[in-house]
Amino acid sequence: MKIKVIILMWVLKVLLKIVKFCRMAEGKMKTPEVFYSSESKDAYIYFVLHEHKAHACFDKRDWTIFIDDSDLEKVGKKVRELTTDDSEYFDYLGHLAHEMEHAKQAHSLGGELFDKLYRKSSYYRAVFELEADAACMVAECKARIESKRMLKEHVHSVIDLRVAQANRWLAGYYTSLPIKEAARIYKRFAKKASLI
C-alpha cells in the first residue's frame, strides 16, 4: 500500500512539473508585447524575448526587436497615439529605427559576433552606428515627407548634413570614416527606401 502511495505521489509530482513546463512554454510562445518608456524624451522600445527574433544588448539591457520592416510602421502608429507633437513624433520614430537597425545587424551577424565587433573594433562600431543613423534618417525623412513637412528633393541635402554631423560625432567617440564611405552608407539606405 505504501509503495502504491509513493508511486502515486511521484506520478502527481511529475504531472505537476509537466503542467508547469507547458504553461511556461505557452507563455513564451505568446506574441511579444511592446513597452514604451518616454522618460527624458527618449523612446526606448522593448519586446519580450521571443524565439527567432533579433536580439541585441545595449546599455546593459536586452533589446529584442522585430525584423520585419512593416513593424516600424506598426510601432510608428502606436507612437503617433502617444504624442500629437510632430517634432517629438519624428524623434521617436528615428530613435526606434536606429535601435531596430542595430537589432538587424545583430540578427544577420549573430549576437555574439556583433557584440564582439561592436565593442572591440572601432571601425565596425563606426559602420554600425552610421548604418543605424542612416536608418534613423530614412524613417524621419519618410515621416516628414508624408506629413508634407519636407520635400523629397531635399533628401540629398539632409544626407550631406548627416554625413558631416556623424563624422564629427564619431571622431569624438569612436573613429572617423572617410567622407565618401560614410556618404555611401547614407545613400544606400536612402536608395533602398526610394528617397533618392
Model-derived features: where do they sit?
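Catalytic zinc-binding patch centered on the HExxH motif and its immediate surroundings
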Residues: 24-81, 89
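Preference for well-ordered, secondary-structure-rich cores of eukaryotic proteins
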Residues: 67, 91-93, 158-163
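Short, solvent-exposed loop/turn segments at secondary-structure junctions
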Residues: 40-41, 71-74, 101, 110, ...
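Active-site recognition of the HExxH zinc-binding catalytic motif
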Residues: 94-107
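Short hydrophobic helices that act as membrane-entry/anchoring signals
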Residues: 1-23
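Long, well-structured alpha-helical subdomains associated
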Residues: 125, 138-196
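Post-HEXXH active-site segment of zinc metalloproteases
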Residues: 90, 106-134
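Compositionally biased, charge-rich terminal segments
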Residues: 1-6, 136, 143-145
